[in-house]
Amino acid sequence: MQPKYKIYATLLDSYFNYLNSDVIYERYYGWSENPPCTEEEFQQKQFQELIDRINRKPFDSEVADKGTAFNEVIDCMIENRKSETVQVEKIYSDIGNGEQKVIALKAVYNNRSFVFPISLCREFANYYKEALTQQRVEAILPTAYGNVLVYGLIDELMPTSVHDIKTTGSYTCLLY
């Protein structure tokens, strides 16, 4: 069953955002007296982002880098290994009597530094301690347009669930 198309989740998100650009624009900017762009400009931006995704054009995003760094820190803790892509350092606090304790982890990725509280890192690592990390998955789906290969990476694969780790307090579209 040879696929006619190959699609991944972020590409589907970009396509959805383009198709629904009028609704998204209204939700985020419809109330504004001085929106940053017109609805037509917003639609054109969504179209260009879709084209850039199709062409896999690299993009620079501090928010995405923070998520990548955090995910790698957690995966390293789960797998008890050192990272090959993120430089990680412990941040200490004096607790008296010449003793120190780790209070955070500093992660450097793409020349950007991020600090994650050790309590948060431990909470995530403990929760996902039995997970399989960064699992590539794919499936061929028959559609009216031919067979489609849908593929992607799972951050954390648990026995009965799939988890996509985010470093934002509220995940919504168009965040980065």
Residue ranges of model-derived segments:
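Conserved catalytic cores of phosphodiester-cleaving nucleases, focusing on short active-site segments
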Residues: F70-N71, G152-C173
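Metal-dependent nuclease catalytic cores that hydrolyze phosphodiester bonds in DNA/RNA
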Residues: M1-L153
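Conserved small/polar residues in nucleotide/adenosyl-binding loops
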Residues: Y176
